[in-house]
Amino acid sequence: MAAVLEGQEPEETAAAAEDAATSTLEAVDAGPGAPFLPAGNQLNLDLRPGGCHRLQYLCSQQPPQLLQVEFLRLSTHEDPQLLDDTLAKVPWSLLRLRSLVLKGGQSRGALGACLHGTLTTLPAGLSDLACLAHLDLSFNRLETLPTCVPELHGLDALLLSHNHLSELPEALGALPALTFLTVTHNRLERLPLTLGSLSTLQRLDLSENLLDTIPSEIGNLRSLSELNLASNRLQSLPASLAGLRSLRLLVLHSNLLTSVPTGLVHLPLITRLDLRDNRLRDLPAELLDAPFVRLQGNPLGEASPAPPSPPDISQVPEMPRLLLTSDLDSFLVTPHGCSVTLACGVRLQFPAGATTTPVTIHYRLWLPEPGLVSLGPHDFLLSSVLELQPHGVAFQQDVSLWLLFVPPRVRRCREVVVRTRSNNTWNDLETQLEEEAPKRLWARCQVPHFSWFLVVLRPVSNTCLLPPEGALLCSSGHPGVRVTFPPGVTEEPRQVSMQVVHMAGLELRTLLEESEASVSPLLCLSQSGPPSFLQPVTVQLPLPPGVTGFSLDRSHLHLLYRTPLTTTWDDITTQVALEFTHLYARFQVTHFSWYWLWYTTKTCVGGLARKAWERLRLHRVNLIALQRRRDPEQVLLQCLPRNKVDATLSRLLVRYRGPEPSETVEMFEGEKFFAAFERGIDVDADRPDCVDGRICFVFYSHLKNVKEVYITTALDREAQDVRGQVSFYRGSLPVEVPAEAEAARQRKGTDALWMATLPIKLPRLRGAQGSGQGTDFSLMPLNLGDAETGFLTQSNLLSVASRLGPDWPAVALHLGMPYHKLQRIRHEFRDDLDGQVRHMLFSWAERQTGQPGAVGHLVQALEQSDRRDVAEEVRAILELGRHKYQDSIRRTGLAPEDSTLPGTSASQTPESAQA
């Protein structure tokens, strides 16, 4: 084995060490004192606990097999002192050791994340391992590189990933045989200048660190073939990188680069240069046209933003800060400006002078529904809808708005924008993203007026103002897509934009049942102004994957055009003159719409393109219905993407039980659907989202699509269980979805709208549970709240009391009830839990009658007690009451008509949908 290792590449050495993990320690576990013998030249002690004790035992016994060991794996999830004592014995006992793996990561935390080992240093004696060629210290707690490592002059591969290293020592350059070095996922802020002395280094991985500069000495690594600097903070690169003549792979994505050395494109062996997700705005033509360069996610062709002028701190007074609670829906803005945080998490900042007179701002957070949400064919909704009033009010200075949104699952070639309604049209605002914490993202924008606002994920859009002199528009998501406008193409400047949508090749081949089929990215071109141009415009699209301009069969290539305002795709291959290069196809058009290149042996491509386009917009989901274990009358309904079902169920089944999820169904973004309880089971509440006994949903793929409802039955539960069911039915589709798409997707049969049915069981009531709620409980009529915000009546409070159960003491304390009074209620109703809850809730309510903010206090107490399900039900009751009150005063003519919602009438109640 030793003779073979002399000529192995570093990856082969690492692979040999990894193969050692599959061997086991030959041990006789018959009793204490059993001998532990290595298997051949491999000793693997990381697969079982107690590895250090086993190694110490072997070192003390010195069996002959120990002298043959060349591969040692030892877990670092051990006591630090025991680990240090054990490693100190290694140089004296394992003289032929060539590979030493001291990794953490074998243990996992509660959330499944790999845990780091306890290793913080190495004994100095390890430098005596003269044969050591492979050292793996990954997933540990190293803050500095142990001093013995640079003294291992025979080291060929060094793995330091997932540690806490902030720098590497200058002595690292004294490893003359090193060919493989990885230091990913550390905290490196600088690199040693001696790194350039590693003349034999072939692979270097420094990704996921904090590097902002690279020393020019890195250009001395003449043998380097792979260099990974992804996910750092690099703003520029040294020109010496162009001297790495052996370089084949250079990965620089997810940095802050604004420029790159032009010489990189001339490296003789380079096969991939990854520059995605940087800040590159202008690149030489050699880099733009090179087939091995990846440029997605860069603002190519966009103008640099003007740097903000620093404010004069000495003259700027401190801005007032307002923090609104859940019972407030308005605030006052004065000419001095203010910073406001709404109860829903939204933030606003009004600069001084934004208003000339005091203005009262009202806000409301709407649950999304088609009438309130405007989405393009390939857009996804990421937030609820925020309404700010008064609509259309003009500010003297732009107001800053921060909206929380759901982090998108996929960001490749997509961008997050804030969408607003202005002059009866929806527009996207220039948006910056800010990360407060992992998975807590803000979309920030400047708003000149108030209206409706929502956060949308859309394909990357590139826009320019086209002058009569012509222009070149490139896609930052796919730099190979570009549109060339010749001089004289327009008389007046007009706005032109492009979007590029990708389709997975596997889905296409499954749809066409053809293994060789492929398509180019889908290109959408739009403009403001006349529908056609004065001169033809040249469009460049990349050829479908696997197809080159020199080998393609032209009879299999089709250029498709989607007619505006229709759903049909026309094959216009014979109507345009297609020009081909090795990687691209070029053609000229005078109208803008959707364009798509297909390479297939099929002949009727238009119909297939329509199906493929619809497939891009469909989501495969499953429906679940679960009952709370301690309260079967509480039912959770949710629509989940297929790939999230298992993880969600594993989290919910601790508190819920229920049937298996439904079969997979397909839904469009923004599609309505309903849940109807059947066979003796009904919804036990008057809810604004309950229409004709059915719970209304609107599906948005990135939102939760979940509701918790309470159910009841008119059947006798004292005699037996009530076995009912909940069925899910389709509702209306978004307006942009064509009718033929709806028809093609529906089931054939008597009920084409039915999607799934899941069983629901209300268990038999036993003993005193069979008596009706509150049959022996009587109070005077009670109203909490007011007509504007909504009332809670006696029956509403009884319903709330029936939900609380053993959680009522926590709610009572959050409502401000003294602990001694809580104990007295427990004593007076010690055998009656329902009596305890009702007495607590109604005694509090009687004291609050006529006082403002009582209902908001109750909702806040429920949320603080982790009963958000009951808090949402209270909000739903108030919402319904508020709508009824507003409708009644409109019918009697006591109030003027409010400004209507987009897509709804003034008298129409917006149908709530679950975010």
Swiss-Prot record:
Entry comment describing in which tissues the protein is expressed: Ubiquitous.
Class of this enzyme: hydrolase
LRR repeats: 131-152, 154-176, 177-199, 200-221, 223-245, 246-268, 269-290
Coiled-coil features, chain-numbered ranges: none
Any GO BP annotation: negative regulation of apoptotic process
N-acetylalanine PTM positions: 2
Stretches the record annotates as Disordered: 888-915
Induction entry: Induced by TP53/tumor suppressor p53 and gamma-irradiation.
Keywords per UniProt: Acetylation, Apoptosis, Cytoplasm, Hydrolase, Leucine-rich repeat, Nucleus, Phosphoprotein, Repeat
Site residues by UniProt (Cleavage): 450-451, 592-593
Subcellular location: Cytoplasm; Nucleus
Active-site residues from the entry: 449, 451, 591, 593
Positions of post-translational Phosphoserine modification: 304
Superkingdom, taxonomy of origin: Eukaryota
Region (UPA domain): 585-721
Cross-referenced InterPro entries: DEATH-like_dom_sf, Death_dom, Leu-rich_rpt, Leu-rich_rpt_typical-subtyp, LRR_dom_sf, LRR_domain-containing, Peptidase_S68_pidd, ZU5_dom
Function field: Component of the DNA damage/stress response pathway that functions downstream of p53/TP53 and can either promote cell survival or apoptosis. Associated with CRADD and the CASP2 caspase, it forms the PIDDosome a complex that activates CASP2 and triggers apoptosis. Associated with IKBKG and RIPK1, it enhances sumoylation and ubiquitination of IKBKG which is important for activation of the transcription factor NF-kappa-B.
Quaternary structure, from the entry: Forms a complex named the PIDDosome with CASP2 and CRADD. Forms a complex with IKBKG and RIPK1. Interacts with FADD and MADD.
Descriptive protein name: p53-induced death domain-containing protein 1
Organism: Mus musculus (Mouse)
